[in-house]
Regions:
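Conserved glycine-rich cofactor-binding loop
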Residues: 10-11
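SDR active-site lid
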Residues: 158-223
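A short, exposed helix-loop element centered on a Lys and neighboring polar residues
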Residues: 105-106, 150
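Substrate-binding pocket helix/loop in short-chain dehydrogenase/reductase
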Residues: 81-82, 89-91
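Active-site-adjacent segment of SDR/Rossmann-fold oxidoreductases
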Residues: 130, 151-162
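Residue(s) in the substrate-gating loop at a strand-loop-helix junction
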Residues: 125
């Protein structure tokens, strides 16, 4: 069994991954910005880790000990039109979703490289391969994350470190409700914002995604990109078949 460090394990997908991996007998190191939120998880170790804070990352990596697998899951969402989204919010989003992931990778990768083995698993999104309006800042952070992950596959793969990107579609967590939204009452983009529900399509559970992550970790030769569930598979297949001559939308917009 592997020793697995999970970021953002306090709720949603991260929490489900911790429970699934612990149930399969792996040594699980669950981390979150507020470690008290991890108290009831059936894991081996619970650590404070803020992926946006270098000292916090360094401390957690040291306390965790030898790590075979990193599951990079910590993330958040911002909803706003690109015309008016506060750039400070976009910067914060990238610090968490993108740079935070790389920060933790830089903490665990040297030991993996020296051992000649290890796994880096990134929880991304179908929005790392296609663009949705209003949630574009989130998608941009995931596009960047996937570029980093693919680069790591080319670089660290030479030393025996395997990289995978798990891509869920819409997931039944409170992530959407918790997203920071920036709209005024007379915002000209409100009609588009109100159509976002139609873009969600079929929804999978956090537990569904956790099973995909665990199965990926346990595969001897995992693929680079792993759609999490049939809805994600359909969405990504449709995007792949679509022309690049025009912006792609999975459903027609009427606003």
């Amino acid at each position: 069994m592997s020793s697995v460090l999970i970021t953002g394990a306090s709720k949603g997908i991260g929490r489900a991954i911790a429970i699934e991996l612990a149930g399969r007998g792996h040594r699980v190191v669950a981390t979150a910005r507020r470690p008290e939120t991890l108290a009831d998880l059936p894991v081996d170790q619970r650590l404070q880790l803020d992926v946006t804070d270098q000292d916090s990352v360094d401390r957690a990596v040291k306390e965790a000990g030898e790590i075979d697998v990193l599951v990079s899951n910590a993330g958040a969402t911002v909803r706003a039109p690109l015309e008016t989204v506060p750039l400070t919010e976009v910067e914060k989003l990238f610090q968490l979703n993108t740079f935070g992931a790389l920060r933790v990778v830089q903490g665990v990768l040297p030991a993996m490289r020296e051992r000649g083995s290890g796994r880096l698993v990134f929880v991304s999104s179908i929005q790392g391969r296609l663009v949705l309006p209003i949630i574009t800042p989130y998608g941009a952070s995931k596009w960047a994350l996937e570029a980093i992950a693919e680069g790591l596959a080319l670089e660290a793969g030479h030393f025996g470190v395997k990289v995978s990107i798990v891509q869920p579609g819409a997931v039944a967590t409170n992530g959407a409700a918790a997203a920071n939204s920036f709209f005024t009452d007379d915002d000209p983009y409100l009609p588009l914002y109100r159509q976002l529900g139609a873009l969600r399509g079929d929804v999978v559970t956090a537990e569904d995604v956790a099973v995909v992550v665990a199965d990926t970790i346990e595969q001897p030769e995992p693929p680079l990109r792993v759609p999490a569930g049939a809805p994600a598979e359909r969405a990504l297949a449709a995007r792949k078949q679509a022309s690049d001559a025009m912006p792609y939308m999975p459903v027609p917009l009427n606003w």
